[in-house]
Amino acid sequence: MSKEAYKGTVRLTVAQAIIRFLSNQYTERDGVEHRLIAGAFGIFGHGNVAGIGQALLQNEIAPAEGENPMPYIMPRNEQGAVHAAAAFAKTTNRMQTWMTTASIGPGSLNMVTGAATATTNRLPVLIFPSDQFATRIPDPVLQQLEDPTSLDVTVNDAFRPVSRFFDRINRPEQLIPSLLNGMRVLTDPAETGAVTIALPQDVQAEAYDWPVEFFAKRVWHVRRPPAERAAIERAVAKIRAAKRPLIIAGGGTIYSEASEELRAFAAATGIPVADTQAGKGAINCDHPCSVGGVGSTGGDSGNHLADKADLIIGVGTRYSDFTTASKTQFKNPDVSFVNINITPFDAAKQSAEMVVADAREALVALTEELADYRVDESYTAEIAAEREAWAAKVEQCYHVGNAPLPAQTEVFGALNELMGDEDVVINAAGSMPGDLQALWQAKTPVQYHVEYAFSCMGYEVPAAMGVKLARPESEVVSIVGDGTYQMLPMELATVAQEGIKVIYVLLQNYGFASIGALSESRGSQRFGTKYRQRGTGSHLEDTDTIAGVDIAANARSWGIDVLEVQTIEEFKEAYKAAAASDRATMIHIETDLMGPNPPGSSWWDVAISEVSVLESTQRAYEDYQNDRKPQRHYL
């Protein structure tokens, strides 16, 4: 198209055009607007320092008229940057995110894990990996991987399977449709995930005459599709026919901001509500229909009701194997499913009656159609009894009095008592998500932030930064095990650098508690799951000296205040001090590697060696054969 067809043009580099365009992108839902891209995380190298780096500098010190600021933060690791962006997006219910940029080769590849974490969790992040020269004159450039079978393949093709949208810009004019489609995916509640646009380093710096309309304010209206009338009628028929219905609330309930409608629906119908990791807090824990977590790491109340349910109503859940207990949780031979989900892919799971719609819109419609419906009083009494019995077990776990080291459940109990309803607790990996899902009492949708789709070790440290950027008014508490800490601790330096006040609770047990317990139960004797200094044996033994990192000293070296405690009472006092401080603080406490953990009533399928010379493995395989017998497809 000729220049004359536009109202005018402006000459900018590709990188400058990206920043100016992104500074004027907004989302809108329910009449509320937000800046879609709230800021930029970036680590610069030769692949982006003179492109995106220059554009961010120019935005900061010499922005053009109509160009909004693009706040920039320098992280320490590219994976951590993407985790922070994803945590920010999760906290804003996917209305906002951050962009990330890295240099070519290893810097860009470091973002692949973060992209997978975001996409698995259905969270929008915008990633700009740098790429080799489009001209191919400097070839191979530093950090370029050569593929002799195809010269257009680069390491950034690794982003394709973990991104919801992928593109590579080899000419400036390709940027316009690429960015517009990227924004479409970021703001589509059914399609969202990682959007990756690879930028050759020479193209980033190439100038082009851009139509000025490209940089005008653009508002992306986040849709709330209602359910088809026929789908609601079919769902209503199944609910009316059920004797023991159970709702499973997933993360989509929270992202839809449908908690009020879920509470109203449960109160009107008496149908109990269990929650997934992503859905915890969708209904307040003190609601008479709230029965807590369900699945492999759920509590007895939710799981006992799930065992006998004849109808499961999934609201915004993707039915991970932890939710279904590897397809053994729903034991009623006549169980069927109604799935409310904005994504047809998830709505179709478990051969369900599909209600493809926004969760809030569908719940409103169901509440209206079921105005005269309520579960039987005997079922209501059973729900109350299950709630009461599990509440007593939660109290036992929170106050177990373990010695000589406290159990991690006691730390969680103290936090649950001390944190406010609008504060945020963060976790992702190890034994802690299981204990938290079973025990944590969440009263609001914002309080519980556990990434358990990709369950990425290392998420917790950078995630705290992203959450605090999204909710500066809240106390943000990230619970970190010593295993996950050693995967990705360096964003502590970024937190200190930016003066971001968060609280880290570091539980040090000198090993991998979760995988150690799993290893033992599967016949592998906790092999390779404890930190030990190698002795004279052929493999690490319990009798070998504990080899632990001095994490307290390490955290101080990053610029974080550290409070070291030994008892739960000391922990409570330390938390109060950390909350009163205006600096980032770590509370360090040693906990018992061997538990105890909450009682579990559900299974998880981890395949066991079919043949082995080890008796422990042979016994575990026999148990495995029995445990998997209830598995089935729900048809």
Please identify what each model-predicted range represents.
Residues 163-166, 394, 398, 562:
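Short amphipathic alpha-helical interaction patches enriched in hydrophobic/aromatic residues
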Residues 2, 6, 173, 211, ...:
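Phosphate/pyrophosphate-binding active-site segments
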Residues 136-150, 347-348, 355-356, 363-364, ...:
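Thiamine diphosphate
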Residues 2-374, 414, 418-421, 501-504, ...:
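N-terminal alpha/beta PP-like core and its mobile active-site loop of ThDP/TPP-dependent enzymes
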Residues 158-159, 209-215, 387-393, 552-555:
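Short, basic/glycine-rich phosphate-binding loops at helix/coil junctions
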